[in-house]
């Protein structure tokens, strides 16, 4: 009897060890692979890959995130990370980026700046009335451009050359990352600001907002998620998000389930994601780098 018990215990121990090893192997297989790291940036906040043009646009705050000293600029980085060049300068503290009809838009403190890509020149600065801190940008297929107001809450919309507050609800306090998904604008938030810098009294949320009637639907099951920044839709109710303060990139599933993808340290900002190649381009504001990872 004793021998049988010992034998059974040995088998169970072996099975547990095997499962642990298999689990570790699966985790290793699923971990993103680092492809390259580009240096020479200045507090990079957002990366946007235009694979057809063979370039990654990167906004550089270059100082105070709320500053208006015209030190900010947009850089162009090659898809292999080997070439970094300053492209458009004279900005305040540019953040989110989106392309629409051959123009690159960036949230620049209190203005939505419009850049003609072919000319490499600023063609318009759309002053957002009452904006606290404009941040991420998204464009729909009708040419409308949306920009989050992290400082003042909610979202502005540029349509027909006119910019106005489009969404102003309590749930969107500290609105940050934006992504168009079908007929909805996906919004993640930094959290409710206390008025002391970027300190929050409660963490950020994951929301879906109907473009047709502005109906807000919670994707997080009513639970707070983090000091959210980057956002990309993976389809099927799944998203990639970044938590700037925690320094992590995570997979988020509607309902609130999360899985850590990368742990890179504080300052992990508004990444760019190319779904075709499954490459994520992560700007590190505190390290002045842009790093590319291949997702599994």
Please annotate each region the language model reported.
Residues 1-9:
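Bacterial N-terminal signal peptides that target proteins for export
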Residues 15-24:
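C-terminal segment of classical bacterial N-terminal signal peptides
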Residues 201-260:
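Glycine/small-residue-rich hydrophobic helix-like segments
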């Amino acid at each position: 009897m004793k021998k049988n018990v010992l034998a059974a215990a040995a088998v169970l121990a072996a099975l547990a060890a095997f499962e642990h090893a298999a689990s570790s192997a699966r985790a290793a297989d699923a971990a993103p692979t680092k492809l390259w790291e580009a240096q020479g940036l200045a507090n990079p906040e957002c990366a946007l890959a235009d694979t057809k043009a063979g370039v990654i646009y990167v906004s550089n705050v270059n100082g105070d995130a709320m500053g208006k000293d015209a030190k900010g600029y947009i850089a162009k980085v090659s898809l292999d990370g080997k070439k970094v060049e300053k492209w458009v300068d004279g900005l305040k503290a540019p953040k989110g980026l989106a392309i629409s009809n051959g123009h690159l838009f960036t949230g620049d403190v209190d203005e939505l700046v419009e850049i003609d890509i072919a000319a490499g020149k600023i063609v318009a600065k759309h002053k957002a009335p009452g904006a606290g801190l404009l941040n991420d940008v998204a464009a729909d297929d009708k040419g409308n451009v949306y920009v989050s107001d992290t400082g003042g809450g909610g979202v502005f919309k540029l349509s027909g050359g006119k910019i106005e507050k489009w969404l102003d609800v309590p749930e969107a306090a500290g609105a940050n990352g934006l992504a168009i998904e079908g007929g909805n604008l996906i919004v993640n938030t930094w959290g409710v600001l206390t008025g002391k810098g970027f300190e929050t009294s409660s963490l950020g949320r994951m929301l879906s907002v109907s473009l047709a009637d502005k109906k807000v639907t919670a994707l997080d099951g009513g639970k707070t998620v983090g000091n959210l920044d980057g956002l990309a839709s993976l389809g099927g109710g799944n998203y990639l998000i970044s938590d700037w303060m925690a320094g992590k990139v995570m997979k988020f599933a509607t309902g609130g389930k999360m899985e850590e993808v990368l742990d890179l340290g504080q300052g992990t900002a508004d990444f760019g994601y190319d779904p075709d190649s499954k490459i994520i381009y992560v700007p590190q504001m505190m390290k002045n780098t842009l790093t590319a990872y291949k997702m599994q």
